[in-house]
């Protein structure tokens, strides 16, 4: 099997076309229609600064933004301490998947969907294709897998959301000034559309 090299190839191989009428034919699962209430979780290395939002990793490289200024004040210059350095500070030391799942169940949730990988390229699950995973860096545990087991044990549906499609441009701001984004040693995480053009 060959790996598709373009988005068009992926679409052509899939069950849908890239238009709304094709998606409209998709049968919505009964568990979703009947679920009424679910929990979507945004949590990852971007929560370390406890500043801004899950877009901190992008905005910290946008000169003049509140996140950029916060990062400089708290961590120093972006060349010496960038987003990659926040990842190992993301320890998830108080993460208790059983406690989370029980809270979700008591709230009446029927399904739980965490973001498995945000635009930052850091996978919250075990993955053989990257060293930038919660199993290999930061918490050094499969937080998504642990949460999945706890949620399913309580008879709730578990899903995972991937936001990686926007990773290719997410760190572009760091190319405009001296930052770790410009260092080829970190290209496997801090990928930019500029790198795609080379």
How does the language model describe each region?
Residues 2-122:
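N-terminal structural segment of carbohydrate-active enzymes
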Residues 27-28, 32, 71, 140-142, ...:
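Catalytic-domain carbohydrate-binding cleft regions of carbohydrate-active enzymes
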Residues 79-96, 126-142, 181-190:
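The substrate-binding groove and active-site-proximal loops of carbohydrate-active enzymes
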Residues 100, 143-147:
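A general structural detector for well-ordered alpha-helical segments in enzyme core domains, enriched
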Residues 107-140, 170-176:
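Aromatic-lined carbohydrate-binding/catalytic grooves of carbohydrate-active enzymes
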Residues 148-152:
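Surface-exposed amphipathic alpha-helices with a cationic face
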Residues 157-169:
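Aromatic-lined carbohydrate-recognition surfaces of secreted/lumenal glycan-active proteins
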Residues 191-196:
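Conserved small/polar residues in nucleotide/adenosyl-binding loops
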């Amino acid at each position: 099997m060959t790996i598709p090299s373009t988005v068009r190839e992926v679409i052509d191989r899939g069950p849908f076309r890239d238009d709304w009428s094709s998606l409209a034919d998709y049968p919505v699962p009964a568990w979703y229609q009947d679920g009424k209430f679910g929990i979507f979780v945004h949590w990852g290395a971007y929560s370390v600064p406890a500043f801004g939002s899950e877009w901190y990793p992008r905005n910290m490289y946008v000169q003049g933004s509140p996140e950029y200024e916060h990062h400089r004040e708290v961590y120093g210059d972006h060349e010496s301490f960038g987003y990659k350095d926040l990842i190992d500070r993301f320890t998830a030391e108080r993460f208790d998947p059983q406690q989370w799942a029980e809270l979700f169940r008591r709230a009446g949730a029927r399904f739980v969907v965490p973001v498995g990988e945000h635009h930052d390229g850091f996978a919250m699950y075990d993955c053989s294709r990257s060293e930038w995973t919660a199993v290999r860096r930061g918490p050094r545990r499969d937080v998504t897998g642990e949460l999945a087991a706890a949620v399913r044990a309580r008879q709730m549906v578990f899903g995972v959301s991937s936001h990686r499609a926007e990773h290719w441009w997410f760190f572009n701001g760091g190319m405009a000034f001296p930052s770790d984004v410009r260092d080829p040693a970190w290209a496997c995480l801090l990928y930019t559309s500029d790198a795609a053009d080379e």
